[in-house]
Design a protein with these regions (language model features):
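Short cationic amphipathic helices and targeting signals
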Residues: 102-108
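N-terminal, charge-rich interaction modules
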Residues: 1-92
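Duplex nucleic acid-engaging cores and interfaces of nucleic-acid transaction enzymes
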Residues: 95-98
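Helix N-cap motif at beta-to-alpha junctions
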Residues: 109-113
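Helix-rich interaction surfaces within compact, conserved domain-sized segments
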Residues: 116, 120-166
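Compact, Lys/Arg-rich rRNA/RNP-binding cores from ribosome-related proteins
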Residues: 100, 114
Length: 166
Protein backbone atom coordinates (compact mmCIF):
# COMPACT_ATOMS: atom_id res chain seq x y z
CA UNK A 1 0.00 0.00 0.00
CA UNK A 2 1.54 3.27 -1.13
CA UNK A 3 1.58 6.13 1.36
CA UNK A 4 0.67 9.66 0.30
CA UNK A 5 3.03 12.56 1.06
CA UNK A 6 0.41 13.93 3.48
CA UNK A 7 0.24 10.63 5.39
CA UNK A 8 4.02 10.45 5.63
CA UNK A 9 4.21 14.09 6.78
CA UNK A 10 1.58 13.40 9.46
CA UNK A 11 3.40 10.29 10.72
CA UNK A 12 6.71 12.19 10.67
CA UNK A 13 5.21 14.94 12.85
CA UNK A 14 3.92 12.34 15.30
CA UNK A 15 7.36 10.72 15.47
CA UNK A 16 9.17 14.01 16.04
CA UNK A 17 6.69 15.12 18.71
CA UNK A 18 6.79 11.78 20.54
CA UNK A 19 8.60 11.05 23.78
CA UNK A 20 12.24 9.91 23.50
CA UNK A 21 12.13 6.40 24.97
CA UNK A 22 15.89 5.82 24.91
CA UNK A 23 17.75 5.14 28.15
CA UNK A 24 19.53 8.50 27.78
CA UNK A 25 16.33 10.33 26.89
CA UNK A 26 17.75 12.68 24.24
CA UNK A 27 19.76 12.82 21.02
CA UNK A 28 23.53 12.62 21.53
CA UNK A 29 25.27 15.98 21.11
CA UNK A 30 27.80 14.51 18.66
CA UNK A 31 25.08 13.74 16.09
CA UNK A 32 22.44 16.41 16.79
CA UNK A 33 23.34 18.31 13.62
CA UNK A 34 23.26 15.14 11.48
CA UNK A 35 19.86 14.14 12.88
CA UNK A 36 18.61 17.69 12.30
CA UNK A 37 19.79 17.66 8.66
CA UNK A 38 18.06 14.31 8.05
CA UNK A 39 14.84 15.39 9.76
CA UNK A 40 14.77 18.68 7.82
CA UNK A 41 14.28 16.67 4.61
CA UNK A 42 10.64 15.95 3.73
CA UNK A 43 11.44 12.34 2.75
CA UNK A 44 13.11 11.21 6.00
CA UNK A 45 12.60 11.03 9.75
CA UNK A 46 14.94 9.49 12.31
CA UNK A 47 13.21 7.07 14.66
CA UNK A 48 16.24 6.29 16.83
CA UNK A 49 19.89 7.25 17.00
CA UNK A 50 23.09 6.74 18.97
CA UNK A 51 26.43 8.42 18.26
CA UNK A 52 28.25 5.41 19.66
CA UNK A 53 29.05 4.59 23.27
CA UNK A 54 31.27 2.72 25.65
CA UNK A 55 29.69 0.59 28.35
CA UNK A 56 31.04 -1.29 31.34
CA UNK A 57 28.50 -3.82 32.57
CA UNK A 58 28.24 -6.79 34.86
CA UNK A 59 26.73 -10.02 33.55
CA UNK A 60 24.83 -12.57 35.62
CA UNK A 61 23.30 -10.09 38.04
CA UNK A 62 19.99 -10.68 39.79
CA UNK A 63 16.89 -10.13 37.69
CA UNK A 64 15.58 -6.63 37.21
CA UNK A 65 18.37 -5.26 35.02
CA UNK A 66 18.22 -4.90 31.25
CA UNK A 67 18.98 -8.18 29.48
CA UNK A 68 20.37 -9.83 32.63
CA UNK A 69 23.13 -7.29 33.17
CA UNK A 70 23.80 -4.24 35.33
CA UNK A 71 25.30 -1.18 33.66
CA UNK A 72 28.14 0.21 35.77
CA UNK A 73 29.40 2.89 33.38
CA UNK A 74 28.28 4.36 30.09
CA UNK A 75 29.36 7.31 27.99
CA UNK A 76 28.51 8.66 24.56
CA UNK A 77 31.58 10.93 24.69
CA UNK A 78 35.35 10.44 24.81
CA UNK A 79 36.42 8.81 28.06
CA UNK A 80 39.61 9.20 30.05
CA UNK A 81 41.02 5.75 30.78
CA UNK A 82 41.37 6.55 34.50
CA UNK A 83 37.65 7.35 34.68
CA UNK A 84 36.88 3.90 33.32
CA UNK A 85 39.42 2.17 35.57
CA UNK A 86 37.92 3.87 38.62
CA UNK A 87 34.55 2.31 37.83
CA UNK A 88 35.99 -1.24 37.71
CA UNK A 89 35.30 -3.40 40.75
CA UNK A 90 36.16 -7.00 39.82
CA UNK A 91 34.27 -8.22 42.88
CA UNK A 92 31.07 -7.36 40.97
CA UNK A 93 31.37 -10.64 39.03
CA UNK A 94 31.73 -10.93 35.26
CA UNK A 95 32.61 -7.44 34.01
CA UNK A 96 32.56 -6.66 30.30
CA UNK A 97 33.75 -3.57 28.41
CA UNK A 98 31.80 -2.89 25.23
CA UNK A 99 32.08 -0.32 22.44
CA UNK A 100 29.05 0.16 20.20
CA UNK A 101 29.39 2.33 17.07
CA UNK A 102 26.97 4.89 15.65
CA UNK A 103 23.54 3.67 14.62
CA UNK A 104 20.67 5.53 12.97
CA UNK A 105 17.20 4.26 12.16
CA UNK A 106 15.56 6.38 9.48
CA UNK A 107 12.03 6.07 8.18
CA UNK A 108 11.96 6.90 4.45
CA UNK A 109 9.02 8.06 2.32
CA UNK A 110 9.78 5.66 -0.55
CA UNK A 111 12.08 2.78 -1.34
CA UNK A 112 13.92 5.01 -3.82
CA UNK A 113 14.64 7.54 -1.06
CA UNK A 114 15.91 4.71 1.16
CA UNK A 115 18.15 3.39 -1.63
CA UNK A 116 19.70 6.83 -2.11
CA UNK A 117 20.47 7.25 1.59
CA UNK A 118 21.63 3.62 1.81
CA UNK A 119 24.17 4.26 -0.96
CA UNK A 120 25.43 7.31 0.96
CA UNK A 121 25.78 5.22 4.14
CA UNK A 122 27.71 2.46 2.34
CA UNK A 123 30.04 4.96 0.67
CA UNK A 124 30.66 6.57 4.08
CA UNK A 125 31.87 3.21 5.42
CA UNK A 126 28.72 1.98 7.18
CA UNK A 127 28.88 -1.43 5.52
CA UNK A 128 26.36 -3.13 7.81
CA UNK A 129 23.51 -0.81 6.78
CA UNK A 130 20.28 -2.14 5.35
CA UNK A 131 16.72 -1.43 4.27
CA UNK A 132 13.64 -3.09 5.74
CA UNK A 133 10.26 -3.07 4.03
CA UNK A 134 7.41 -3.31 6.50
CA UNK A 135 3.68 -3.68 6.42
CA UNK A 136 1.59 -0.90 4.94
CA UNK A 137 4.47 0.51 2.87
CA UNK A 138 6.74 1.38 5.78
CA UNK A 139 10.37 1.75 4.58
CA UNK A 140 13.15 1.80 7.21
CA UNK A 141 16.88 2.31 6.76
CA UNK A 142 19.32 1.24 9.45
CA UNK A 143 22.72 2.93 9.18
CA UNK A 144 25.19 0.66 10.99
CA UNK A 145 28.84 -0.21 11.18
CA UNK A 146 30.34 -3.53 12.19
CA UNK A 147 33.14 -1.88 14.21
CA UNK A 148 31.99 -2.98 17.68
CA UNK A 149 34.20 -4.35 20.44
CA UNK A 150 33.44 -6.51 23.48
CA UNK A 151 36.17 -7.44 25.99
CA UNK A 152 35.87 -9.38 29.27
CA UNK A 153 37.40 -7.44 32.20
CA UNK A 154 36.81 -9.88 35.05
CA UNK A 155 35.39 -13.36 35.51
CA UNK A 156 33.85 -14.60 38.75
CA UNK A 157 35.40 -11.64 40.56
CA UNK A 158 38.93 -12.19 39.19
CA UNK A 159 40.46 -9.34 37.18
CA UNK A 160 41.58 -10.43 33.69
CA UNK A 161 43.36 -7.17 32.76
CA UNK A 162 45.94 -4.94 34.41
CA UNK A 163 45.11 -1.61 36.07
CA UNK A 164 48.34 -0.20 34.62
CA UNK A 165 47.91 2.66 32.17
CA UNK A 166 50.67 3.09 29.60
Amino acid sequence: MKMTPEEFRHQKCQTLQGVDLSRKGCIDDAIKLLVEVINNRDEFVTTSSCSGRVILFCENIAEGHKKGCKWLFTSHDSVEIQELINSVDPAEGNLVFKYEPLILHIRCFTLDHAKLLHTCALEAGFRNSGITLGKHGKVMLAVRSCMGLEVPISENGELLVSHKVK
